[in-house]
Design a protein with these regions (language model features):
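ASCE RecA-like P-loop NTPase motor cores
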Residues: 1-138
Length: 138
């Protein structure tokens, strides 16, 4: 349950939240509660959802004019759950390569505040996360 996950995140030491967008909507984990957030997929609304379908029909290009802006907003909210104040630190891992392979990916990249961005292979991901955890990240 979300309550159990919240309890684990606040009681445990170093933590990584890996979940769906519903986990970060309305969640405030300020401070050291959350060290890393892994986003497996860009948070696009489900096109088959009747509400999403109805809203998309209001636009000439529902994907570009509705789905992308909605996903970018959710993406920004996800990042915001990790970094809540000027003193918070964390790693935001995006596993969805569409952020660099699709034309709309730049909209997601521009939605992030100024921060260090690294594009790494999956083989280098865990060593990079370990160096961040150990304080040797450069």
């Amino acid at each position: 349950s979300p309550a159990r996950i919240m309890r684990m995140l606040t009681e445990e030491g170093k933590t990584i939240a890996w979940g769906t967008s519903s986990l970060w909507e309305g969640v405030d984990l300020q401070g050291a509660s959350l060290d890393a957030l892994v986003m497996a997929r860009l948070p696009f609304p489900v096109p088959s959802d009747p509400i999403v379908a109805a809203r998309s029909e209001l636009f000439e290009d529902g994907f570009s004019e509705y789905s992308i802006p909605e996903a970018v907003q959710r993406f920004r909210q996800g990042f915001g759950r990790l970094i809540r104040s000027r003193t918070d630190r964390g790693v935001f891992v995006i596993l969805d390569n569409r952020i660099v392979t699709k034309q709309y990916g730049v909209k997601f990249q521009r939605a992030l505040p100024r921060c260090t961005v690294r594009r790494v292979s999956t083989e280098r991901l865990f060593p990079l996360l370990e160096s961040w955890r150990d304080g040797t990240f450069e």
